[in-house]
Amino acid sequence: MGKVIGIDLGTTNSCVAVMEGKEPKVIENAEGERTTPSIIAFANGEKLVGQSAKRQAVTNPRNTIYAVKRLIGRNFIDPMVRKDQGIVPYNIVKADNGDAWVEADNNKYSPSQISAFILQKMKETAENYLGDKVTQAVITVPAYFNDAQRQATKDAGKIAGLEVLRIINEPTAAALAYGFEKSASKTIAVYDLGGGTFDVSILEISDGVFEVKSTNGDTFLGGEDFDTRILNHLIDVFKKENGIDLSKDPLALQRLKEAAEKAKKELSSAVTTDINLPYITADSSGPKHLNIKFTRAELEKLVDDLIEKTIEPCRKALQDAGFKASDIQEVVLVGGMTRMPKVQEAVKKFFGREPHKGVNPDEVVALGAAIQGGVLNKEVTDILLLDVTPLSLGIETLGGVFTRLIDRNTTIPTKKSQVFSTADDNQHAVTIRVFQGEREMAKDNKLLGQFNLEGIPPAPRGLPQIEVTFDIDANGIVHVSAKDKASGKEQKVTIQASGGLSDAEIEQMVKDAEQNADEDKKRKELIEAKNAADSLVYSTEKTLTEYGDKLSSDDKGAVEEALAALKAVLESEDTALIKEKTASLTAASMKIGEAMYKAQSESQPAAENATNDEKIVDADFQDVEKK
């Protein structure tokens, strides 16, 4: 079994790690950074991933996709999706299956596809470091992700060419990294406030056993929301001062978003910062500039309710675990937003203790995923991870009631069966509608999917016995079966969201990804060939100007001919032809090199004589013998 990589697929940034010997290690990307922006851009037929995509976002806002994790596994009509639509500069569109997709460069992409591009970058980063092909991974998700979101994340891994051995909850991964090779028994809380999601998990750690007691959270609360508050504040201030609404200008929005994120980070260590955006827009009176002094106190006032929103899930998680805040021996901070002093203050106030800051909040989740990868391929022993399902699972029964089969915070994997019956006389089929959530009425919860059980023998209502079995695997993904006990008829299904990607769609996206990988490789090869050719043209022209008179007319003609031939194909898209003409010019220009060395060797004796002459100076001297 090869190396299993651990990937933290984040809303804002992603990170990849691997077990090296007995220690997990974060792998640096090609730019030398330990995290990669979760940003994809499409520009002039090219796909950019990570830092290169982020750099050009200001000039290409419509085709630069970020924070797609907030859309994954969500329906287009989801209120949270509608909320994001008014904020992001790119288009969020309705897919044929009702899901929220994104549009860029006149193409539609599912959030799973966009996530797959980021995962491919992580995969390449690991392969470049390991010098070997990587095919297996453990990918992290927010603990409060529902089944549809988990399935969509697994689909993203498949599209990226990865076998996803395990989907692991982010706080659980962080706890693994925190408690790795520590023998002390502890009850800990992991407070994870990332770029787009918030989770809190309560765990008991003892002798290598990591048992999650409860989890809670909000999959639409994170750093992006903090950025939006600052962004809206800047828009309001500018509108009051200049009477211009910047919210309608995608270019200005992108610049404001970057400035908001930068200011937020700076105010974690400073108490005041200047936001300067020259030429943010223009009107009939000329260009307009944005120049605002922004303080930490102003920021804290803007986001106070967002920080407060993280406290209620903490309270619920403690209650579900059967603990009081005073029972928690350590609070581990995870996610970039936990660097904010006001967040740390709120955590300290609620739990009554100083939070633990000994882990890197940007890297700890990927490290934990790598440890879990090590467990799965037997590199790491003596660790047992017991996770839970974050939400209750059940089916819709008579009157639209939500009947729970598996309660939230049940340890997974788990299996539960319950017998139901028909609602009408001689009913020959039943529709099983599967929901996930905590509300009492089915319609108020998340519909995961539905299927039919047909061929039930005619009988009075209430007589047939239909056994419904829920099976949740270690990834937190739901499998459901329904069986008529009288006829033995059975229907099994792995729940696919009412939207979601079909197997055929995933297969097509896998092929597209492979094809794009080939095209990207070819594109890179073409660019490298053009760069080499361009460099050779420049150096040949320069040396030809300096030493052309030293060449015979035949040699000079051959070089000029090869030079003209290469210049003629520089703009072509034919890599082989460019390489061929580059090789021809390289061979022809060797004559220039010979002429250069010959000229240098001929001038050397003269140079030496010149040097000796330079040492002769006039001097007075006396003839000693005549003295």
Swiss-Prot record:
At the top level of its lineage, which domain of life is listed?
A: Bacteria
Q: Does the keyword Phosphoprotein apply?
A: yes
User: Signal sequence: where?
Assistant: none
What protein name applies here?
Chaperone protein DnaK
Which residues are annotated as modified residue Phosphothreonine in the UniProt record? 197
Its keywords, alphabetically, are: ATP-binding, Chaperone, Nucleotide-binding, Phosphoprotein, Stress response
Could you tell me which Gene3D superfamilies the record lists for this protein?
A: 1.20.1270.10, 3.30.420.40, Actin, Chain A, domain 4, Substrate Binding Domain Of DNAk, Chain A, domain 1
From which source organism is this entry?
A: Rickettsia rickettsii (strain Sheila Smith)
GO MF term set: ATP binding; ATP-dependent protein folding chaperone; unfolded protein binding
Q: Entry's HAMAP family?
A: DnaK (MF_00332)
Q: Provide the function of this protein.
A: Acts as a chaperone.
Give the region (Disordered) as residue ranges: 598-627
Q: What does the entry say induces or represses the expression of this protein?
A: By stress conditions e.g. heat shock.
Matching Pfam families = HSP70
Q: Where is the composition biased (Basic and acidic residues)?
A: 612-627
